[in-house]
Swiss-Prot record:
Keyword Nucleotide-binding belongs to the record: no
Reactions catalysed: [protein]-peptidylproline (omega=180) = [protein]-peptidylproline (omega=0)
UniProt-listed HAMAP family: Trigger_factor_Tig (MF_00303)
GO cellular component term of the entry, any: cytoplasm
Protein name in the entry: Trigger factor
Domain (PPIase FKBP-type) ranges: 171-256
Reported function: Involved in protein export. Acts as a chaperone by maintaining the newly synthesized protein in an open conformation. Functions as a peptidyl-prolyl cis-trans isomerase.
Family: Belongs to the FKBP-type PPIase family. Tig subfamily.
């Protein structure tokens, strides 16, 4: 075997490899001998078929198998000897001319092919004991609990009809019939009867609810609005419309007493038990938010500490996935890059940076896990599947069967578990300091969230 490196640029390598025809012939001959005891050919006793006859019958197919196996074995040996870890599948170029192929399959010429690869760079891991990570922690206050219970009460609030002649105010529930038109023409989905609208809930298109303020039962108004530019229906997006609207009833929200009786309507023994349940839920929510903030901070630190060239093909793949998703969302919303105060080129540059970061962090996390023998057990994956199934009541078996028969979906469940275990490993070594923060600071928008791996 002769190997010549024809390209070495960064992480990209290309080799020209030649395997003598005599080597191929010897391997194919061994396969034919092995085949001798396995095939049945009329006119010959089992195991007595001459190899020469087998070659006439199976020679081309056996040589094709031999060539395929030789390429795999040769590549594996080459990559192992040079310490290469492949970022993507190798690209192999074989002879394509019919005459060359015939010569090769008949064993009359050497096997010569090229293999192009892109490798994962060597990654020097940082000393995680030097990492300083801040852990924001917010205490659940009585006010937080009271606010949470008030939100629950608001969603369970009842409404009662207002007195005759009363007008609708913010917070009232108005039952309406309406017919919408654009340029005088009724449009699909633009009519409704018995529709309930809570003024100020912002559940209808902008401007609709506000124009119901002051309306009385039995009164008809023409509401003039414009559909948002990012409205889900492209035909309606940005269009001015008029809705001939009649109010059939006006109802005011009723005060609801937050007491033991209210707690019992929710299946709890008392108000104290409701407060306990609300506090437990908030504690879990705050802990989840803390975890996300710590993880983002750690990923930022890993990003800073591991600057290397990411395999271009992996970056391209990650970028294309993100960009296709961005374009689909923008097209669906009817938005342009100008609406986002940017240009397509600037947006592409930003998303390519994010793609590069994600690939590098993925490689770093993988390297950490591999060097420290971090694995995900089947039990852990099984628990994740069960959790997914619980989120879809009535379809548990369908979910379970889906993951059992779909290796790719199972891998997608395994990946975040693996990532979290690696993150936990690093946090055990890092210097993590708690910092008391308010609930508002804990949940504040963080640009780093966009780039978290």
């Amino acid at each position: 075997m002769q190997v010549t490196e024809t390209l070495s640029e960064g992480l990209k390598h290309e080799f020209k490899i030649s395997v003598p025809a005599s080597d191929l012939d010897a391997k194919a001959g061994a396969k034919l001998v092995d085949l001798k005891d396995k095939v049945r050919i009329n006119g010959f006793r089992p195991g007595k078929v001459p190899v020469a006859h087998l070659k006439k019958v199976y020679g081309r197919s056996v040589m094709a198998e031999t060539i395929d196996q030789t390429i795999r074995d040769t590549n594996t040996q080459l990559f192992s000897e040079r310490g290469f870890r492949l970022a993507t599948e190798p690209k192999i170029t074989m002879p394509s001319e019919q005459a060359e192929v015939e010569e090769l399959l008949s064993g009359k010429t050497d096997l010569t092919y090229t293999v192009a690869i892109e490798v994962v760079p060597s990654i020097a891991l940082a000393d995680f004991k030097t990492f300083q990570v801040e852990k924001p922690v917010a205490d659940v206050t009585d006010a937080d609990v009271d606010e949470a219970i008030k939100r629950i009460a608001d969603t369970n609030r009842g409404y009662a009809a207002k007195a005759d002649g009363a007008k609708a105010e913010s917070g009232d529930r108005v039952t309406i019939n309406f017919k919408g038109t654009i340029n005088g023409e009724v449009f699909e989905g633009g009519t409704g009867e018995g529709i309930q609208v809570v003024i100020g809930s912002n559940t209808f298109i902008p401007g609709f609810e506000e124009q119901l303020t002051g309306i009385g039962a039995g009164e008809t108004r023409t509401l003039k609005v414009s559909f948002p530019k990012n409205y889900m229906n492209d035909k309606l997006a940005g269009q001015p419309a008029e809705f001939e609207t009649t109010a059939t009833s006006i109802e005011a929200p009723q005060d609801i007493a937050i007491d033991d009786e209210f707690a019992k309507t929710l299946g709890l023994e008392s108000l104290d038990k409701l407060k306990e349940a609300a506090r437990e839920r908030l504690v879990a929510e705050f802990a989840g938010a803390t975890r996300q903030r710590v993880k983002r901070a750690l990923l930022d630190r890993l990003d800073e500490a591991h600057r290397f060239e990411a395999p271009p093909s992996l970056v391209d793949e990650e970028f294309n996935l993100m960009w296709n998703s961005v374009k689909a969302e923008m097209d669906s919303a009817g938005k342009t890059f100008a609406d986002e105060d940017t240009t397509e080129d600037a947006a592409k540059e930003e998303y390519r940076k994010i793609a590069d970061r994600r690939v590098r962090l993925g490689l770093v996390l993988s390297e950490i896990g591999e060097k420290n023998k971090i694995t995900v057990t089947d039990d852990e994956v099984g628990r994740a599947v069960i959790e997914r199934a619980r989120q879809m009541p009535g379809r548990e078996k369908e979910v379970w069967d889906y993951y059992r028969s779909n290796a790719q979906a199972l891998a997608q469940l395994r990946a975040p578990i693996y990532e979290d275990k690696v993150v936990d490993f690093i946090l055990e070594l890092a210097n993590v300091t708690e910092k008391k923060v308010s609930r508002e600071d804990l949940y504040k928008d963080d640009e780093a969230e966009k780039t978290a791996a």
